[in-house]
Amino acid sequence: MDASAALSELFRVSTQVVEAVVTGPGGDVEAARTSSDARAQALAGVGAEVLSRVAGMRAGEPVERVQVDLDGGSLVALTDGARTVVATTVARPTAALVAHDLRAALGRIEGGAR
């Protein structure tokens, strides 16, 4: 399945994800479900930055997921080492369920890390 189809499936099964973007190993947007291309690029950039900053605080330990809770929802960035999915959610999401849904979306993409 390609990244676009994986995002379509994510939105079919998840009621808590509002928007999402998948980036490839180089950080390029492979697929997005956002209001605009500019929003997709911004979301991808913020996700990469959050993962990078947290990884820098962990002394060499890999970081798979970061969740930032905001007033109106959350930002969740999750990586499998090859691709990254960054999503915004409804307010007070079920964190483990969102993480599961994002991990499953990455797992559906052909050529990704398993």
For each predicted feature, which ranges?
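Non-catalytic interaction/Regulatory regions outside core domains
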Residues: M1-R114
